[in-house]
Amino acid sequence: MAQHDENVVWHAHPVTQQQREQHHGHRGVVLWFTGLSGSGKSTVAGALEEALHERGVSTYLLDGDNVRHGLCSDLGFSDEDRKENIRRVGEVARLMVDAGLVVLTAFISPHRAERQMVRERLGEGRFIEVFVDTPLAICEARDPKGLYKKARAGELRNFTGIDSVYEAPEKAEIHLDGEQLVTNLVHQLLDLLQQSDIIRS
């Protein structure tokens, strides 16, 4: 990774993060959805974004597949590329949090070290790890993209849960049962955001 040039300096903005948050009426924060492919991350994150939007909360959803069409289109699925994928997404999420948004990210992000890296980059109280815990057998039965079938057939290498490890969170801010109804999971997340004074009741 390239080092910073000594002539590149950080410029403070005239409008502060606090002012942006006052404008939005809520705090800026990242909800980092993690779990196996097919666990329901994107589905739950999308449903939560809809619920927040209806409440007037300024949001943005960053989806694992979508960013690989542009921001991360040059990356593959090696451990090194996955780390860089998460680093880039973390930096984008950080900028959005500075803008006062509630950012929802739906990424397998299989390694604890990468998730911790983003947590530290965001800072205290700005990173909420959401573990969508769905058994591998259920994820494989759902297989919405047909990826498990390809992985089992040897057509897809380095697939998380099959021939690449997934490190489950040890201390996620919220642990969701991915077999529950999406509406129930959204209510749990809304309760957490309200109790944490991120959004208003």
Swiss-Prot record:
Protein task: Catalyzes the synthesis of activated sulfate.
Coiled-coil positions: none
Alphabetical list of HAMAP family matching this protein: Adenylyl_sulf_kinase (MF_00065)
Protein name: Adenylyl-sulfate kinase
InterPro entries the UniProt entry points to: APS_kinase, P-loop_NTPase
Species assigned in the record: Klebsiella pneumoniae subsp. pneumoniae (strain ATCC 700721 / MGH 78578)
EC annotation from Swiss-Prot or TrEMBL: 2.7.1.25
Pathway given in the UniProt record: Sulfur metabolism; hydrogen sulfide biosynthesis; sulfite from sulfate: step 2/3
Catalyses which reaction(s): adenosine 5'-phosphosulfate + ATP = 3'-phosphoadenylyl sulfate + ADP + H(+)
Family affiliation: Belongs to the APS kinase family.
Record-linked Gene3D superfamilies: P-loop containing nucleotide triphosphate hydrolases
Keywords associated with the record: ATP-binding, Kinase, Nucleotide-binding, Phosphoprotein, Transferase
One of the protein's GO biological processes: sulfate assimilation
Binding annotation for ATP: G35, L36, S37, G38, S39, G40, K41, S42
Any one Gene Ontology molecular-function term assigned to this protein's record: adenylylsulfate kinase activity
Top EC class for this record: transferase
